[in-house]
Structures are given as structure tokens and as C-alpha cells.
């Protein structure tokens, strides 16, 4: 990580702290992650702005505040094994991989998955398992998970993801179509409590179609 990138990442973490992010480990991970690595060169100058940016294939790299907020919500439950649905650029995975012992991540667009794998390897993050597949179905043979994070909006909550939560596990997911709410579901035996966190805007979670 260059000195310029490090300074920019540290400044981004400070902005997120001012915006309400409080978890010190999340802020540290943001400050140590070169966001420009996850963007095309043409957009690298915007890497440390607190905004979502296109990454091709109709997908985006999420706004840093949302990345940090979802991570903070997940870490409140001290997960040991986490599933990310929607690898995308790999930026969210890079943040999570610094904070949890084991990360599994699924992407339905092959080209994005290949790029993300290469980027995390460059960052020497080796506690990540990648899967090319339909995130709507989760990763049954690697379940149960202490935490599941979905980085695209589902019109309804996928039952498969709820079923793959461990006891006490949490699912962080944007739900809705035009109007979306970031929600947290917590498993207690065969029951699930839900909590609305805030209004968000994500690309849709596609069911079944691989690209």
C-alpha cells in the first residue's frame, strides 16, 4: 500500500467515524485497505470518496459507509465463520477477511469472482473460500454460519440463507425492490427475530442466473 493510498484510506476511516461508525476494528480495516485496488484505473481517483461506484457487469462497489455499517452490525455478534453473498469487486470481502477467522464468499458473475480472488491474494488474505454460484441458495455444505452478509437487495428473504444460520447467528440483508431496508435477522432455535436498521439502495439479488 503506497503512502498516498494509506493516507487516503486513513482519512476515509476518519470520515466514516464522523458519520457514526464506532467499531475500532472496522475503522482499522478500512484504513488498511487500498480501495483503488478494487476499481478500474479510470475511477481510482474516486476510490476514497464515500460513494458507490460502478465495477462493470451492472454491479457496483458499495459506499464505504454501508460496507462499514454492515460489517459493524455483523461483528456485534462476534462471528467465527461468515458467508458473504455477492463478492462483487472483493472490497467487502477484504474488510471481512481481516476481521473474522473464516470467510466464504459467493459470486454469480465469473469475471468478477476471478478478479476478486486475485485482489485478495495480492493483499495476502488467505482465510477466504470462493464459490461461483447462485448466492440465493447460500453454501449448504459449508453451513452453518455464525453470520451471513448479503450485498444485494432481495425482494424477499431467501429461506435457504435463514436455514444456514447457526444458533444465535445473524443475517444482514437489504430487503425490498424500489424501497429497500437494511435488516438484521437473528436465529433462536427455529425462530427468527428481525430488526430494521436503515433505508439503503443496492443492486438486486438475482435468483438462479449465472453469468
Curated annotation (Swiss-Prot):
GO terms for cellular component: cytoplasm. The active site is at 62. It comes from Shewanella sp. (strain MR-4). It comes from the Bacteria. This is Protein-L-isoaspartate O-methyltransferase. It is an enzyme of class 2 (transferase). Its main location: cytoplasm. GO terms for biological process: methylation; protein modification process; protein repair. It is found in: Cytoplasm. The gene is pcm. CDD domains: AdoMet_MTases.
Amino acid at each position: 500500500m503506497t503512502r498516498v493510498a494509506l493516507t487516503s484510506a486513513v482519512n476515509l476511516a476518519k470520515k466514516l467515524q464522523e458519520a457514526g461508525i464506532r467499531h475500532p476494528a472496522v475503522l482499522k480495516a478500512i484504513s488498511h485497505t487500498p480501495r483503488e485496488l478494487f476499481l478500474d484505473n479510470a475511477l481510482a481517483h474516486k476510490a476514497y470518496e464515500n460513494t458507490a461506484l460502478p465495477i462493470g457487469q451492472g454491479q457496483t462497489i458499495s459506499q464505504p459507509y454501508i460496507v462499514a455499517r454492515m460489517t459493524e452490525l455483523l461483528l456485534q455478534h462476534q462471528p467465527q465463520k461468515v458467508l458473504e453473498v455477492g463478492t462483487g469487486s472483493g472490497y467487502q470481502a477484504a474488510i471481512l477477511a481481516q476481521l473474522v477467522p473464516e470467510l466464504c464468499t459467493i459470486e454469480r458473475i465469473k469475471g468478477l469472482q476471478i478478479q476478486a480472488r486475485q485482489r485478495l491474494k495480492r493483499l495476502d488474505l488467505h482465510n477466504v473460500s470462493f464459490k461461483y454460484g447462485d448466492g440465493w441458495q447460500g453454501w449448504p455444505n459449508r453451513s452453518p454460519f455464525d453470520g451471513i452478509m448479503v450485498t444485494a437487495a432481495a425482494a424477499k428473504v431467501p429461506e435457504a440463507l435463514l436455514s444456514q444460520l447457526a444458533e444465535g447467528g445473524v443475517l444482514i440483508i437489504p430487503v425490498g425492490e424500489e424501497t429497500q431496508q437494511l435488516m438484521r435477522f437473528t436465529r433462536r432455535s427455529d425462530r427468527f427475530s428481525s430488526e430494521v436498521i436503515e433505508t439503503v439502495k443496492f443492486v438486486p439479488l438475482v435468483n438462479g442466473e449465472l453469468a
